[in-house]
Amino acid sequence: MDTFAVFGNPINHSRSPRIHALFVAETGITHPYGRVLAPLDGFEQTLRQFFDAGGLGANITLPFKERAFSLCDQLTERGALAGAVNTIKKQPDGSLLGDNTDGIGLVSDLQRLDLLRQDSRVLLVGVGGAARGVVLPLLAYGCKVVLTNRTFPRAQKLVGFYHHVGDISALPLERLGTPDYDLIINATSTGVQGSIPPLPASLITSSVCCYDMYYQQGDTPFITWCRRQGSLRCADGLGMLVGQAASSFLLWHGVLPSVLPVLETLRAELSA
């Protein structure tokens, strides 16, 4: 059986098994890694069965990161602060350790792309599991973060978790309109449905950078929209995916694989 796997719904699109196969090729570490389509009403049971059957590590993707948090026996500091986990490790005593590597994956990719400064004004769209993992690293980097979401009380609640850490606030979608941001990050799952979050076009100018945590072959719907509004610097989340995967591999095996060669390989495969 695969002793490592990514759990999500949907999951067939995931490039995580390919990423980890490339990590294995680099490191020589045995690491059988697969995909698991977890039912929306049976994620917890599916994950427990995986570990009971000999699973050693799991990655968690949408829409289960917050639910996975509650299944862990211990949490790393960043996992606890995020309130959501994307990585789980089975400990020698059988307990489950939860971590969140999304933030380090995002910040390292934004640094690689030169899209982030310590004083960047960041609009983070969405407050689900994907967003929860990146708020703290952005604040720790020195960014001013504004949250927005279809359900505004959820954004306000998340601000309450982090107001003591850095400069963070929330605005309802209907109050967005002026280009007050250096970077707009789409942390919603709208790309999976081929749609975009309901943002006003007036947010985008040529100087506003746009980043979509989602990725696909070619531009995502969000990036296509941002380019049409005039943004000159856009990127998808493939680099974030590889970065968080490398940190997951480190948690499981104590070895940090290279990110850039894997990213270049995946980008070439997606462009073929």
Swiss-Prot record:
Binding site residues for shikimate: 14-16, 61, 86, 102, 215
InterPro entries noted in UniProt: Aminoacid_DH-like_N_sf, NAD(P)-bd_dom_sf, SDH_C, Shikimate_DH, Shikimate_DH-bd_N, Shikimate_DH_fam, Shikm_DH/Glu-tRNA_Rdtase
Residues of the signal peptide: none
Gene Ontology terms: biological process: amino acid biosynthetic process; aromatic amino acid family biosynthetic process; chorismate biosynthetic process; shikimate metabolic process
Entry-linked CDD domains: NAD_bind_Shikimate_DH
Pathway of action: Metabolic intermediate biosynthesis; chorismate biosynthesis; chorismate from D-erythrose 4-phosphate and phosphoenolpyruvate: step 4/7
Alphabetical keyword list: Amino-acid biosynthesis, Aromatic amino acid biosynthesis, NADP, Oxidoreductase
Sample GO molecular function, one term: NADP binding
Top-tier EC class: oxidoreductase
Annotated NADP(+) binding sites: 77, 126-130, 149-154, 213, 237
Residue stretches spanning the membrane: none
Reaction(s) the record says it catalyses: shikimate + NADP(+) = 3-dehydroshikimate + NADPH + H(+)
Active-site residues per Swiss-Prot or TrEMBL entry: 65
GO CC field: cytosol
Enzyme Commission number(s) of this protein: 1.1.1.25
Function per UniProt: Involved in the biosynthesis of the chorismate, which leads to the biosynthesis of aromatic amino acids. Catalyzes the reversible NADPH linked reduction of 3-dehydroshikimate (DHSA) to yield shikimate (SA).
NCBIfam families listed in its UniProt record: aroE, PRK00258.1-2
Family: Belongs to the shikimate dehydrogenase family.
Subunit: Homodimer.
Protein name: Shikimate dehydrogenase (NADP(+))
